Regions:
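Short, solvent-exposed secondary-structure boundary/capping segments
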Residues: 76-87
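Short coil-to-beta-strand transition motifs
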Residues: 19-22, 59-67
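N-terminal helix initiation/capping motif
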Residues: 1-32
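Short beta-strand-centered aromatic/proline hotspots
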Residues: 25-27, 64-73
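Short, conserved beta-turn/loop elements at beta-strand boundaries and strand-helix junctions
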Residues: 32, 73-78
Length: 94
């Protein structure tokens, strides 16, 4: 059984540093409306989540601060993959 295409924005596959409240991670891919990243911890679909993604720009590092919800998780070894929607975001200097 296949899932219907649910993404509204094109994903960019790029490893970027993700900062969470009590953990760090790295993105597998991201888009304006969501991100998938590997981290440690326990997450539940539907759970609210806040995270920041570090971006390196021509004018220096920026933090893309995001709020959203966990869509799904994918356990792997000692890590967990987290797919999250982004419902609010701001861009700030690091």
């Amino acid at each position: 059984m296949t899932r219907p295409h649910q993404r509204k924005d094109k994903r960019v596959e790029v490893p970027l540093l993700v900062l969470l409240e009590n953990a760090r991670g790295v993105t597998r891919d991201t888009s304006p409306s969501g991100a998938f990243f590997w981290t440690s911890g326990t997450y539940t679909p539907g759970q609210p989540i806040s995270f920041a993604i570090e971006l390196k720009t021509a004018i220096g590092k920026m933090m893309w601060k995001c709020k959203g919800a966990v869509v799904r998780t994918e356990p792997r070894d000692h890590m967990v993959g987290v797919a999250a929607t982004i419902t609010e975001s701001t861009m700030e200097p690091a």
